[in-house]
Amino acid sequence: MQSKLVALLIIVLSFGGCTSKNSDENSSGKIKAAVSILPMKFIAEQIGGDKIDISVIIPNGSDPHTFDPSSKTIKKVHDSDVYFKIGGTFVFEKNIISDLQSNDISKFVDCSKGISFIENDPHIWLGMDESKIIASNIASKLIRIDSKNEQFYKSNLNIFNQKVDSLKSVVHERLSDLSNRKILVYHPAWRYFLSQFNLIEESVEKDGKHPKAGDLRQIINQSNEQNINAIFIEEQFNPDAAKSIAHELNIPIIKVNPLTENLFFEWNNFSVKIKERAN
């Protein structure tokens, strides 16, 4: 991985003298931004609107834990005016972006600034409160780059925050009377979201690995005692990984998408599915 990364970096830097970046910027008049995943694009679009063009580095349907970028993908980062990082321990950014950042630190914005991480869990975009902090960090950078449109970005940030708060109230009312506050997920991605509604995430995966037979038996026994009524698995994962648990507990496997293109939809969708299984 490291040898390939070095080769990619050499290829990227070799484009430096012949890139058409400046002509692209002048013709479009837009800020060229890059992000790691679709949810970050969603937040950035809410703030930047038609003032920015956004490249998503990890394609829809790919697993960020295993994604291996091409030289063309890395060049997108190189050619961008700004890269909105998730920050923290997000694996793709730790493995790839950190090396690129050393060449142009001013380009990279750590959107986790101001967020208190839960046990180094990188899935901050799924927390409704955390998404507002991410949006604020994006707005601050866009204002520094494009100060003449400061009010545009501030207004969009206000609108985004109001939408998040409004949906959060709906979700809170929907989930407030659940008798079972524990939610079983395959991959531990939802703590930021669930904790804001006093729900507890129980995960099958530990440290990115499927449990061994003894640990799996313990999870099944605990889930049975806790009256777990569903197992939620990410669309990017093979549902076969959860089948043995679902079969033993006689519960359904329900797909959710932490890498959604529309956070408003997925927050609402996940909460509806939790509520449906509670009835």
Locate each region found by the language model.
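Extracytoplasmic metal-acquisition and chelation regions
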Residues: 18-279
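Sec-dependent bacterial lipoprotein signal peptides
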Residues: 1-16
